[in-house]
Each structure stands twice: as C-alpha cells, then as structure tokens.
C-alpha cells in the first residue's frame, strides 16, 4: 500500500509524456483538474486545506485535491477497484475520513491526511457499498456487499454487529436453470437518510440479480435487527445509482435513484420517505432527443437552475434538467461529446464535480452552476489529459500509416471478414477500402426483425422443447420464399452476406432447408450465419446439434459458409468439452465453425481467448472470431458505465485479437470513422494477420480440458445472480474460479489459471491480456485416457510453428482439479501441481524467441524467412496509460529492431532486453530481423 502526500500544487508529468496544469474550460464556469488516472467516482469533503475533492481511480487509488487543482495526497490501497466510497467526519475533528468498499472484500478507512486508519474485512467477497450513520451522538460505519451481510463497524474499525440478509429479505428467484436461495440478497447500496428532527435512518437497497431485478428498499432504525419498512422499487432493471437529496429544503431527505440499463429501459425515480411514494420517469420517452444506444447509469442530484430547484441527471454524455414534475418530457437537455463516470454535488459550494470521461479520460471537472454560462461550457467541454493524448496518438498512427509500404518479403494479407459493419455511416470509406485492398472483406449484414414462420411440427416432432421455442425479439412472419428473397438479394454486388440465423432462445429462426437454399444462391460467395448464446444441456439440445447445427456445418463446409458461434461466459473452456460437442472438437467440420464470444457480463476474457485459440491451434477449427459491442465494459451490470464515445478500447481489442489470428470480426457499428483505422492497418499490411503455424508467442505449456466438472460448468456460466456465495462451497479450490455473479472486480487466487498463466489479477475486463511468459492455450486433451477418439485434427504440434514440435508440455484439468494422463492421479487446484505448472511456464518461456513484460499485451509471428513481427498493445482496456514493453530475447539474436510505421530503431542491452515505449491507447508494430529462419531450426537448438 503506497501513500503519496503533496504539500503544494505541482504540475504533474502525465503518463502520456507531457505536462498539463489545471485547465479551465469556458473561463470560470468549468475548471478541469488533471489527475493522471482514470477517475471513476468523485466525492467532496473538508480536509486540512479546506473543502476538497476526493477521487477513486479505475484501479482503486484514492486521492485528494483542492478545488484549485492542488493535489494533496493519494493512497493506492489494495490495487483493486473500489465499488463505493463515502466521505464523512466520524471522529469529530472537523475533517473527513474516507471509506472505501473494495473489491478485495475489505472496507478501508483513510485519514484526512491520506494515511490508512484501519481495514475491516472477514473474507475476500467484494464489498459493494459503504456509508456512515448517526445514532444519538455516535457515528458508525455501515457496509455490505456480495457475502449477503450488513456490517456495523465502529469508528476504530471493530465489528459491532452483523445482520444477515436472510433474516429479512423478500427477494424472489425466477426462471429456469440453477437458482440461488430465495429470500436473500446482496447489498447494492446502503445510505443514511436524514429527517428534519436530526435523526437518521438507514436505507439498504438489496438485490439478487444484476440484470433482471431492481431489488427492494429495506429501511432500518440504527442498529435494528429488522427493517421497520420495506418497499418495492418502481423502475425496472438493476439500480446503478442511489443518493439522498432535499429538493424542497425542508430538512427531510428524499432518495433519487437511476437504473443501469440501455435506453429502452433507462429510468429515474425519486422516493419520499414519509409515505414511501415514488415518482418515476422513463428516459426512453425522450430517446429521440438523446444519443440512443449504449448502456448508462442515470445519476440525479438537485441544483438551483435560474433560481429554481431542479433535478439534474447525468446520463452518459447528457445532462437532463428536470423540473419538480419529475417528467423528463419537460427536461432541458445539455449534450456533450463524451460520457462521464460520475457526478457529485459539493453542498458547501453547490458546485458539481464530474469524474473522468469514460473513454480513458484522466481529468475531473468542476462545474460552477452559479455561472450563467455553465450550460454552454458543459456542452463545449473538451477534456484534455489522457483522452486528448489517446486521440492524438491515434492520429499519429494514421499519419505514419499513410507513408507505409508493406515489405515485399511478406505474403499478401489474409482475408479478415468484418461481418457486421454498417455501410450507412461511412460508405465512402468502406468502398475505398474495397477498391484498394483484398483484405479486409466487408459482408452485407442483415438485421432480421422478421424471421421465418415454418412448420416445425414434423421436423421437431420428437423435440417439443425446441419445437415451441421462440425469441421474443423476433416477429415470425416470413414464408420460406420471403426469407430466401430477403437474404439472397444481399449477395448482389458484394463479397457475401451475414446475418443472425438463430439464437440460444431459438436456434431455428431460419429452417435448415431455407438456409441451405440461401447459401447455394450465393454461388460460392462467403456466407456467415451468426448464432449468439448457444448453450444447452440434455437430450433436447443434443437433437438440435445433430438435426440442425452439424448438418448445416457439413453443408457450409462445401459452400464457403460459416457458423459464427457467438457464445458466452466460459463456453469455449467448459461446455465445448461436454460429450455432445465432440463433433466440433474432432476437426471434421473445422472449416465451418468459427468460435466467437459475446462477453458482456463476463469477467474471464483472458480465458476465452486462450480457449478459442486452443481449439484453433489444435485443429478443431480453422478460424476464430471476435466481437465488440457497446456493453463490452459491462462486467458489472449494476454499474454499466458503458458509453464510451471514443472506442479506443475497442480498437485496441480488435487489433490485439487480429494480430493473434482472429479473422472474423463482429463489431457493433459505432464511430466507424475511428474504428476504420483497423481496416487500413489490415489493408496496407501494417497489422500482420498470422496463420496459426506462424505464431511464436504461444507458451509451450498448455492446459487441456477433459469433460468439465459439472459444478465448474454450471457456476462459471451462471453470472447474473449475485447471491451464490457460500463460505463452505467457495472455499473449495478450482482451476478456473470466482466466475459467477458474486465476484465483480474480485482478486484472482494464486492457483487460478488467470493469475499464474495470464497475470490477470482481478475478475474484470482483461480483453487485452498480457500473458508475459507466452499465451497458455486451453486445448483439447492430446494424450492419454481423456483424449477424444476418432478425431481428424492431428496433434497440437502438427498445427503450430515447427519450433513447438518437441517442446510442448500438457497438463489436464476438468476446471476443478488436475489429472495425470491415465486419470489415476487427481490433484487439487491449490496443490503443488499449480506451482509445477507455473514453474514450467517460466522455464519453457526461455524456448520462445522472445517474451514481453511491462503491462503491454504482445503477439509475435514469423512474417518472413528471417523476420518476426512483434505487435505491442496498451493493455489498459478502460484505463489506458503509457506502458514500457520490456522485450527479452531468448532463442534468437536480433540483427535489427524497427518500428514499421515510425521507423524508430531499438537495440537490446547486454542482457538481451530492449525497452519499447507504448503510448496511452496505442499500439506498435515492430519488425525484428534475425540471423536465420526459425522454421529450419531444430527445437533442441533453441
């Protein structure tokens, strides 16, 4: 834990390599303070230097600033995210303490000078909310989280009382599948509410589902065992914000709340504590006046607007100013270019404080609402710091790329299929790319609100479950002929078509007969059928595989068509290894199936890329895919700050995955002008797209999956319920652990694959994983009792670069334990086995041409006889910053090291290490010339 105290304002040297002092926007209406970190929450309180701003960053660092921009101190705490912070004087000295509900399971109390006062925690289950409540003359800290308990803590950090939610909760469970126990909840929010007589009550907002339930209010007298009142919440979906206001200034607090949702469900509410009445307003009513798509949290304060109290709601990039009627149809709307993580009202000055822009910003912004120009100042606000640097770094790549010529020694770029780009936003850019380059390839993508209404009674007579399934988002109105005409027309003047052809809710949106006819009409042009969220169990789903998917895959293999399997959660390292999926694993349909992911709500991205690449490297499939959507950052559906207006995170995600071999890209069409840089990088050959036998950044150590442990399979794919925590069950070690809805932001365990293999320390958003010793593939079993029989895929080494021929090392797991090849030994996840694997990964990394450390993601591929292409990417998905990639050369001697875009050259030191800077939000493509062709070297000489 590191604490930094600053006694005077200093100009901060930014991670982006420049100095930016306090910046003023529109003179005195808005002041911006540079923090060098991505600030996710802001509060205010009195410190020794006066009224101050308290911030917490993406990685959990708490810092304090004066309103003039002077930085007072910072405390890095645990290095894990803070789900909540609360600022209040608890010891009566007139200065506030800061309380942080941390994802590591602790509540941290920080003194007013930034030093740590105390830590409270009973387990490693994330704390989610914290507050202070007054009872007579005493103040107490109250906190709760995902262990389903409410804790009263003394001013000195001692546990005073525990209230289990099962004693009073009314949360129900619903739906199919494995469900948690009813009448229990996690603590979504805990807040004090003041009455005009000076007394306080405690409001707990409890929920048990992050996506499909808003939960309930439970109102307690201080220290009471049971709530005195309970109330349902009037708006739907998970609640993302709860705060107290006093709109009429009568001394009695009201509650404002906003949900965490997309525009169709977005809503705000205000609750009167006297009678528990609620007023609500649906933001979707004014959707046409707001940028429509994206996932946001509605956050409401009260301000004086031209002398009148007004509800002010931050909703992504918009501020809604709503009168007392609380009807958003009457709102004044202020629009900015960027969305912000948080807003807070400083009651001592009535100023508003904005947290950083969600697109990687690093500033906080102080809005003086007493200034008549504050509204226009907000609309014109252009954050500087990291956000400005990220955009400039992208422009610099564009400038360098304009002068780039692909070396003649390199082969032509492989086709990369963009299967869902919109041709409406920037048609000229797509047409230019198509006219200049053979790759990327843009398919005609069709959205299908209307799908085929066909007679399933005979074909699915023995499968009533799927015979009767329908997707509520679709209208089943088209005949086979109408379905055919709609889709087959897309082949005209294009390289092919793509579309949703089914979903886990209904795989049969288009009949097999109609789909075969559509594919045939393309005369060999590319067809990609997208199947999201395909997950099933039992005989009924086996019939779907055997009657629909496998026959369609066989037909697709012969007709240049693919099934883009956009699955979720841990599918590619769990369910795919169930017996019913053996045909996909066999390799017989390798040219048809494309493993892809829909990773919203997930916290296991480093696993999913290893799982997809493992099937690719093994020969089960010939290609794999990647998807970007606006809600990719929604690992915690209760706090969906997923409205990034500059999709730099998505650009880096796509570049990393394409550099790793992904050639089917399913992007949500947003800000395509910015994203089109990836198209140009591919077309010109600066972004090298490798064949699997060219990759050299894969660890020789791989983890092979036998049939998954049933509990691992179930829990790792059950991510919406938040109340699964069971102390006894969760003490059992698993190789892949902490994957259900209980663990947002939690730290990974030392024996977890994510920790020892990928260097992923938290359950969050590792879309651009580091794998400093080489990417550790998750593969089908290669040898012994658990190997699939009757496959045609060959051995793993057969499909990989020749250097791997004799250096591979396999370890077998079912997701819970490890097994030896004959199945006679079973070793626990936390046994000596994981240390053996970790050590073997370290040992074998020296056989790779190079490895990279230093917080940059990396990929190496052989691009020509004596040339390697090293791709480096800033790994900070939502908190980009300057990185230094420390490249260590192992089995090769570099002759020359050159950035292919900038021309900058590098030389290793005496230890064979070269440090290469990677700017915030950026990426580099490095050519490494070596002394001989690695394909001709014997592995024993490496």
Curated annotation (Swiss-Prot):
The EC number(s) attached to this protein equal 3.2.1.162
Reactions catalysed, semicolon-separated, are:
Endohydrolysis of (1->4)-beta-linkages in the backbone of lambda-carrageenan, resulting in the tetrasaccharide alpha-D-Galp2,6S2-(1->3)-beta-D-Galp2S-(1->4)-alpha-D-Galp2,6S2-(1->3)-D-Galp2S
Q: Where does the signal peptide begin and end? A: 1-25
Q: Which UniProt keywords apply?
A: Carbohydrate metabolism, Cell wall biogenesis/degradation, Glycosidase, Hydrolase, Polysaccharide degradation, Secreted, Signal
Gene Ontology annotations for the cellular component aspect, listed alphabetically:
extracellular region
Q: Which Pfam families match?
A: Beta-prop_CGLA (PF25292), CGLA_C (PF25291), CGLA_M (PF25290)
Protein task: Hydrolyzes lambda-carrageenan with inversion of anomeric configuration. Does not hydrolyze iota- and kappa-carrageenans, agarose or porphyran.
Q: What is this protein called?
A: Lambda-carrageenase
